[in-house]
Structures are given as C-alpha cells and as structure tokens.
Amino acid sequence: MSFNVDIDEADVAVLNQNLIKSKELFTSISRSLNKISTKSSTASIKIKPILKDVNKLNDNRNQLDSGLNLLSEVSNYASETSKYEAVLNNSIELIGLKKFIDTLTRSKVLLTEMKSNIKRFKGILINFENLIDKSELNLENYFQKSLKSNVMGTNKMNEIILIFQYFYSSSMSGQKTIDKIFMRSQSIKMAEIMRPHEEPTKPIKRSSNIPYEKGSNGINRYNNEMIKAIKGEIGLLNEVGAKINLNASAKDMFVLDIVRKVVNESYAEVIGNFNKVFGQSKILHNDLLILETIENLNHFEKFLNVSNIDVRSFPAFNENYHQLINISSEIFRELIEYSENRVKSVERLTDLNATEAVVELISRIRKLSEYNISLLKLISGMKLGSWLNLKPAVRFISVYTSVIPNLSDDIDETAPEHLLSCFISDYIDSIIINIEIGLKADVSLKKSMQGYYLIKNTILIETIVNRSQQLFNSLGNLGIERLNRLKKRFLKLFLDDWNYASYIIIRDMTTITTTNAVSGHSGSGMSSKEKEQIKDLFKNFNESFEDALRNYEKYNITDVNLRAYLSGEIKKLIMNAYFKLYDKYGSGEFTKNKAKYIKYNKHQFEQILNEKL
C-alpha cells in the first residue's frame, strides 16, 4: 500500500497517527505471512512420503510388467525347447538323420539366443545345453556305427557326409572330434579286414625235396586286400572331401593316419614272420616264396608312392622289409654254389645225366627270372661279381669265363639290370664249365664227344633262354653274346674230327705245292711223287671224313634245332675245303683209277652231307 503525504500541508499529529496505523498493519501482515509459511512447511513435510510411495508404486508396477514379459519369454523358450527335446530325445534311426541334424542345428542357435535373453535362468540353460551335448554324442555314436558298415551304399555315404558337414560347420573342436572318430574307426576297420588274411601268410615248413608251389602262400591275397582296402579309404575320402572342401594335403594326412597302424603292425608282423623262417635255413629252400614276397612288397611300395603315402612313415614295416632284403640277397651266392655242387655231385658225367643237371639248373633260374623285379631289388647295390666270393673258391673261373671286358663307358656296371645279366651269365658259365671239367676228367671220351655233350647242352640252354621271354630279357644283348662265346668254345671242340679232315686238305695241298716249287718241276704233267702225294691226300681225307661221319651218327641227334645248327657248322667248315681240293685235282689225272680216290664230286659231297647230317 502507498500513501502520498504533502509535508507542507499535513499536520504532524495526523502524520504520527497514520504512521502508527501503518506499523500495526505491517505487523499484522507479517504475522499472516508467518502463519502461511508455517502451514506450507507442514504441508510439504506431509506430502513428501506420499510422493515417495507413489514413485515406489510406479517402479514396482514397471518391474512387475518386466517380470511378466520375462516370464512370457521364458515360457515361449520352454515351449520351443520342449519341441526340440521331443525330437532329440528319440533315436536317430527313428527320427531320421536329416531331421535330427536340422533340429540339433536349430537347438544350438536357440541356445545362443537364450544365453543372451534369459541368462538368469541357469537351470533351463544347463538342461538344454546338456541335451545338445548328449545329442551330439548320439550323433558321434551313430557316425561310428555307420562307418562300421561293410557295404557303403549311396544312402550310407550321404549320411556320413551330412554328419561331417554338421561338425565341420559347428566349431574347430567339433571338426577335430569327428576327424579323430573317423580316422580311428577306419583304422580299426582296416585292421579287422586284414586280420583273416594274416594267418595264411605264415610259411609252412616243407621238406627240402618238396618245392614251393607258386601262389600257395597267402602273401598275394594279403597284399591285394591291403591295397584294395587303402584304395577304398582313398575313394571314400575323395567323395567326402569334395562335399566338405577337404584339400589334398588334408586327405593325404587322413589316409596316412588311417593306414599307419595296420601297415606298421599287421604288415610288419607278416614280414617279420617271413624273416624268422628265412633266416633259419638256406635261402634256396624258400627261393620262390622269397621272390614272391619281395615282388608283393615292391608292388605295395610303388602303390604307396603313387598314392602320396610316404613309406618312411612306417618304421617297423621298413625295418623288417630291409631285413628281408639283406637276408634274401644271399640267393645269388647260394645259386652259384649250388650249380657247382650239383654238377660235381655226378660221379661220372654222361650224355643223360649231364643234360639232367642242365635242365634242372636252368629250369630253376628260368622260374626265378619270372620274378625279375624281385631279383633286381635284391641285386641292387651289390658289387659286380661279389656272388663269386665263395669259400671254397668256385673252380670254373680258373678254367674259363665268358666275361666280355667292358670297353665302353655306355655300360653302367652298377645298374641292377647289368648286374643281373652278369650274374645269370656267370651262373650259366658255372653250369657248363663244370660239366666241361667233369667230361675232361674222363680220358676215355674223345674231344669231339666232349664237345658234342657241351655244345648240345649249351644249345639246350640257349633254347630254354629263347623260350623264356623274361630270362631272355634279363640276359640282354651282353648275356646273349656271352652265351655265343660258350657256343664257339664248345663248337671248336665238337668239330675236332671235322677240323682234322679239313686240316688234311689244307696241310697236304700246301705240302704238294711247296714240294713242286722246291723240286723245280715245270712240266705239263704231274711228277710221280706229286701223284702219290695226291693219292695219299684223298685217301687220308676220305678215311678222316668217313670216320667223322661215323662218329656223328653215334650222337643220334633228335633235336631238330641242334641238328640244323651242327650240320650247318660242319658244312661251312668241310665243304669249302673239299671244294678247293676238288677244283684242284677233281679231274683225276693223277690216277688211272679215279673212283678209288675221288669218291664224291661237289654235288655228291654236298648230298652225302645233307643225308648224313
């Protein structure tokens, strides 16, 4: 309130009175304001708890709404998991693999979502996670069961691929788990496949006079089944790998891990059993079985290389394999020793028993030569001629060897093929030269007869060689040349009678010519001395020739090839000499009785040779 006071006109009393009234009014207003303030303060104190309760009620209402929403969400998850449990708690066979895996995949997605949204409900999460773990374990067991099947049909293969794809898409841990199960299962399966084939590989004890029948041991079947099983694993991995993007190195690792146990244990034991038997007797007692075994091992080794499987990954297998090679390489020394002893065991060599020995010994090397790969494997790394280092020393070397000096750098004397050719040639030398030694010990045998026995058996050896493609190839050009050198050596001995007849012509014709030149006879006719010399020449030749024919007929040669060869060599030797004699003195001017001395003209001479030879 405001008042306008005119100080000049107002009375002091009035002014004082107005001041007093104003003071009273202000005092009254102050008291009213104090009352209002007191009441406002009291109201404020009383209102605060009410607001707090209201806010609390609002919070509780919000929490209740949130809880109701959470319970609703949990209820939904529980309903969802219940559906999955209904599937996963049943057997895969009943539900079907694809539905089982699809449900399991969705369950894992749901579990991840639940862990994010209802993580406080640990009981629900744990139970559902346990169900998933149990289901994956069931899937692993089903996988193992599927792998045990002996028949891998299309349906079974598709199931295996589905399981692989599931675990390969889950986690690295899942991938490692399924890989481990697969490799272990397949390794066990391979061992079970090979187990029935192990027993038949064990060598059967035989008497020394009973030969091994080719293929009677189970090593061929064992090796073939092993290769077949590994090929099956490779094929399976190729098919599976294409679906799960398995690279080549990973596939090779799979195969190696699968086959390592069966090769390093089963196959190594098979070889070990061979080593025990072979090490207890002469190699020749089991020669064919040894070569058959090595041939299979070599085949297996090559198969591993082609399949990118390092054979060095199997230490026990390799150790036994190398031991087998070391034991068996003695076969070459034993064969040389056997060939000498076989011929030496014949007390008195005849046409019959010499041929029997040759047939027996050459037939043996022919059979062995069929295992060319094995022989090359055994002889590889050996020193040239080391198979002749025997005690007592081999005796044929001191008499003759058909060895041809190597004058060419083109021949690699360390090559297994060259070593094998040299060995076979030495073996043939040992047979035939030992027969020569035995025949020469019989002083009653003429040289020509000795030569006949030797050339006959050399031709027999040549015939057997020519009929055996593998033996012929193993000998090679060098070996055939060495065989020809033996033929030439014995042909010369055989032609001793014919050489003498031919020698008479050459000797006497030379003597007659020389005598005439010395005597200075230059007349148109022959001197008496020359005529007598010519008569003696024809007489001596006829006797020698007829003697050679008689001796030849005693041989009773039935072999067409042998007869053709010998008759050809005889004709080359004797016909040329006789034709020269006939051309010189065939006119018969040296005698009045031509028929007495000149029994054959050229045509007749050739005709009688054709008839008699």
From Swiss-Prot:
Name a GO molecular-function annotation. Answer: phosphatidylinositol-4,5-bisphosphate binding
What InterPro entries does this protein map onto? Cullin_repeat-like_dom_sf, Exo70, Exo70_C
Please list the GO biological process terms of this entry.
Answer: exocytosis; protein transport
Coarsely, its chief localization is other
Query: Has the keyword Protein transport been applied to this entry?
Result: yes
Q: Where in the cell is it found?
A: Bud; Bud neck
Q: Name the domain of life this protein comes from.
A: Eukaryota
SUPFAM superfamilies associated with the record: Cullin repeat-like
Q: Name one GO cellular component term.
A: cellular bud neck
Q: Which UniProt key words apply to this protein?
A: Exocytosis, Protein transport, Transport
Write down a Pfam family by its short name: Exo70_N
Q: Give the UniProt family note.
A: Belongs to the EXO70 family.
Name the job this protein performs. Involved in the secretory pathway as part of the exocyst complex which tethers secretory vesicles to the sites of exocytosis. Also plays a role in the assembly of the exocyst.
The record ties this protein, via PANTHER family, to: EXOCYST COMPLEX COMPONENT 7, EXOCYST COMPLEX PROTEIN EXO70
List the protein's name: Exocyst complex protein EXO70
Where does this protein come from, organism-wise? Debaryomyces hansenii (strain ATCC 36239 / CBS 767 / BCRC 21394 / JCM 1990 / NBRC 0083 / IGC 2968) (Yeast)
